[in-house]
């Protein structure tokens, strides 16, 4: 029997091609790390099923984006993949999962950053708010869609956030303090 998230992935990624492989491999790595981090926080009573589902769907919108290096041949700029994914998941009746999509880019993106960098996004804050949203966003920073077989160090993950501005680095450092150094999870290749 298919999981709910698998049916959504199958709908938007029906072909067994490189893009689907990239999405599934990256998302499984993010889900595994997010779940490992969540299990460190038993007192928080986190929704582990939701964490797995939302982590598996957080990048669903890449199919609509133009990023040939990862086999995406859509029309939207890559920075908009979170918003695109959120739109897709809201259409599927998954508003809680949609919030993860639109809030995971960088360490979240502020309205101020959107304005100052002239990003093609609505002028509003896209910041992870719930603990589940934060854990998935944090876990995502340790995996790239171009190097599926590697997990980044904290230093490498932080460096990759520099393009989003100092406020994202500050949020990321707070997550390192709150959630700790991530355990090594074997990337799902």
PLM regions and their residue ranges:
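Alpha-helix initiation and N-capping motif
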Residues: 1-6, 94, 154, 169
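Acidic/His-rich, divalent-metal-binding segments that scaffold phosphate/diphosphate chemistry
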Residues: 1-78
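Charge-dense, low-complexity intrinsically disordered segments
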Residues: 17, 21-24, 129, 163-166
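Generic alpha-helical structural element
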Residues: 19, 90, 146, 161-164
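Generic structural signal for well-ordered, non-transmembrane alpha-helical segments
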Residues: 28, 32, 95, 177-180
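Charged phosphate-binding loop/patch that engages nucleotide di/tri-phosphates or the phosphate backbone
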Residues: 161-189
């Amino acid at each position: 029997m298919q999981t709910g998230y698998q049916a959504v992935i199958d709908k938007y990624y029906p072909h067994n091609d490189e893009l689907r492989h990239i999405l599934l491999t990256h998302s499984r790595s993010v889900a595994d790390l997010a779940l490992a981090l969540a299990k460190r926080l038993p007192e928080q009573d986190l929704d582990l099923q939701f964490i797995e589902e939302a982590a598996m769907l957080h990048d669903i919108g890449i199919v609509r984006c133009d990023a040939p290096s990862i086999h995406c041949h859509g029309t939207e700029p890559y920075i908009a993949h979170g918003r695109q994914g959120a739109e897709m998941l809201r259409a599927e009746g998954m508003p809680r999962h949609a919030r993860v999509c639109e809030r995971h880019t960088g360490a979240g993106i502020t309205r101020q950053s959107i304005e100052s960098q002239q990003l093609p996004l609505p002028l509003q804050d896209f910041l992870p708010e719930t603990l589940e949203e934060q854990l998935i966003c944090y876990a995502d920073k340790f995996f790239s869609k171009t190097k599926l077989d590697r997990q980044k160090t904290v230093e490498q993950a932080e460096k990759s956030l520099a393009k989003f501005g100092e406020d994202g680095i500050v949020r990321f450092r707070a997550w390192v303090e709150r959630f700790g150094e991530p355990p090594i999870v074997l990337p799902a290749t």
